[in-house]
Amino acid sequence: MQVILAKHAGFCFGVKRATQLAFQAANIGSETYTLGPIIHSPQVVQRLEEMGVIPVDNVSEVETGGTIIIRSHGVAAEELEAAVRANLEVVDATCPFVKKAQEHVATLSKEGYDIVVVGDAVHPEVQGIVSYAAGRVYVVSSHKDVERLPRMSKIGVVAQTTQSFEHLHEVVAACLARGGEARVYNTICDATAVRQEEAKKLAGAVDCMVVIGGFNSANTMRLAQICLELLPRTHHVETASQIDEQWFKGVKKVGVTAGASTPKWIIDEVIDRISAIDKDKIS
């Protein structure tokens, strides 16, 4: 059984940067916290906790003088301001792509644009982006949501960084159909687009797909969805322990990809587990 790993599986630039900052802070040994999970990988969060980096929900949980790390998804503007007011040492690990989306929203809002954010309203990244709008702001998950919005003469559009370009294009087309001026910033991360395209090609060339990543990871769930649409024998797992050998009955080629928050050690463990199943079948 051949196992094919996607070229760009695993950590993207923003996640790699955030985790490096968190592990560096852990090695210093001072009291360190993250505002929410540093990335959407329970295994990475657990490893950091074991090293003394604790996730908290609010700035108020951190004592004055402590260090707080802003997660890769970013936080709401008011949360960042609260950390500064509390005299905490702030390590900003916000993904640069997310930061750019926040900046675009702030600028567009100041220039009188109503903001449309394409994404998941309950995702922490989107909640953070929305907080930078000074005026009206709407979150839409599809082009159909645009039809329910009020008429706007000036629309500024940005996207959650893990959205697909096709999805953004559909929403923009719906905004333009309603008339008025529209200014659009493509804030989708390049790594997201590359991973999704690779997943499509790989799913079309194998008998079974395994997608690795947190069940709370938006980009991993999107990868799994893309693969599932092309290949019914697609399985989403967080760890190697969730692999079922029954998945590989009659399979000659297995494709493996992983979300942007999935560490290499978990990818390696999953591949080792699949390879071990293959050896057992042979023996």
Curated annotation (Swiss-Prot):
From the UniProt record, list the reaction(s) this protein catalyses. isopentenyl diphosphate + 2 oxidized [2Fe-2S]-[ferredoxin] + H2O = (2E)-4-hydroxy-3-methylbut-2-enyl diphosphate + 2 reduced [2Fe-2S]-[ferredoxin] + 2 H(+); dimethylallyl diphosphate + 2 oxidized [2Fe-2S]-[ferredoxin] + H2O = (2E)-4-hydroxy-3-methylbut-2-enyl diphosphate + 2 reduced [2Fe-2S]-[ferredoxin] + 2 H(+)
Record flagged with keyword Transport: no
Where (2E)-4-hydroxy-3-methylbut-2-enyl diphosphate binds, per the record, is at 40, 73, 123, 161, 217, 219, 261
| Annotated GO MF terms | 4 iron, 4 sulfur cluster binding; 4-hydroxy-3-methylbut-2-enyl diphosphate reductase activity; metal ion binding
Detail the disulphide connectivity of this chain as listed in its UniProt entry.
none
Biological function: Catalyzes the conversion of 1-hydroxy-2-methyl-2-(E)-butenyl 4-diphosphate (HMBPP) into a mixture of isopentenyl diphosphate (IPP) and dimethylallyl diphosphate (DMAPP). Acts in the terminal step of the DOXP/MEP pathway for isoprenoid precursor biosynthesis.
Task: State the protein's name.
Answer: 4-hydroxy-3-methylbut-2-enyl diphosphate reductase
Q: What is the lineage of its organism?
A: Bacteria, Pseudomonadati, Thermodesulfobacteriota, Desulfuromonadia, Geobacterales
* Gene label: ispH
